[in-house]
Amino acid sequence: MAQHESATRRTPAQLRASVVGVLASLVRWAGLVVVLILVIRVLLTIGGANPANGITSFFRSWSDPLAWGFKDLFTPSDAKLRVLVNYGIAALFWLIVSSVLTRIIRRIG
């Protein structure tokens, strides 16, 4: 029995590697969820989805805070182009940030 317990015990380095791996994965997935929300907002807007629809308003309400200062970075007269450019840049920003943070976490760990 004692041999079995010592064989399944993890070293501190193994435990740290597991925690770092999970944390890096969480950061990466969170970034991808944010990007997905922003991209869906762009697709719904470009596609001319009904703004009063529940799905459209859900993604609008979630994407506005995630776009930060990007939502009015460029102000073309066409509303669809404005959403495409500004929310597209915000999606790229979050994709890059989550990727960089994931690499930093893995490198530190």
What are these regions (language model features)?
Residues R41-W62:
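Membrane-helix exit/juxtamembrane interface segments
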Residues A2, S6-S18, A24:
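N-terminal intrinsically disordered, cationic/polar leader segments
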Residues L26, I55-L73, S77:
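Hydrophobic alpha-helical segments of integral membrane proteins
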Residues V27-G48:
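N-terminal signal-anchor transmembrane alpha helix
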Residues V39-L43, F70-K71, V97, L101, ...:
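Alpha-helical membrane-inserting segments
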Residues I46-P51, S77, I104-I108:
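Membrane-interface elements of multi-pass transporters and channels
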Residues P76-A91:
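Individual transmembrane alpha-helix segments
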Residues L84, L92, V97, L101-G109:
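Helix-rich interaction surfaces within compact, conserved domain-sized segments
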